[in-house]
């Protein structure tokens, strides 16, 4: 499950409740279903409305879910993108629209993060 960018201002507890609801709905019919929870990339840090987003706390909420329930792991894409920017990767090199959508490079970051979590 990969949700979050459009809900970046929601408090982590509301976000967590929504993700848990999806998991519970699916597991009500498929109790052995496993989940990979994917946090989103970072939005453009220069856009004022995005500067106080809840994405770090929401990623923490994904880890809480993984700790509370069996068969769930987290792909911390958000943390990877934060590290890329900290280490001087220009945000415009990460985005397809200069705001919050991934480009080809970013899609590879998503894929590599997910494959790493899966142990590939």
Regions found by a protein language model. Name each.
Residues 1-120:
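Alpha-helical cap/lid subdomain in secreted, periplasmic
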């Amino acid at each position: 499950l990969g949700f979050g960018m459009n809900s970046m201002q929601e408090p982590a507890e509301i976000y967590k409740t929504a993700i848990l609801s999806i998991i519970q709905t699916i597991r009500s019919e498929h109790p052995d279903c496993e989940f990979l929870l994917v946090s989103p990339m970072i939005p453009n840090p220069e856009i004022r409305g995005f500067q106080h987003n809840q994405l770090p706390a929401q990623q923490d909420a994904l880890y809480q879910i993984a700790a509370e329930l069996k068969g769930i792991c987290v792909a911390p894409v958000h943390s990877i993108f934060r590290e890329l920017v900290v280490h001087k990767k220009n945000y415009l090199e990460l985005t397809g629209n200069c705001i919050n959508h991934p480009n080809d490079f970013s899609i590879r970051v998503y894929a590599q993060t997910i494959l790493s979590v899966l142990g590939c």
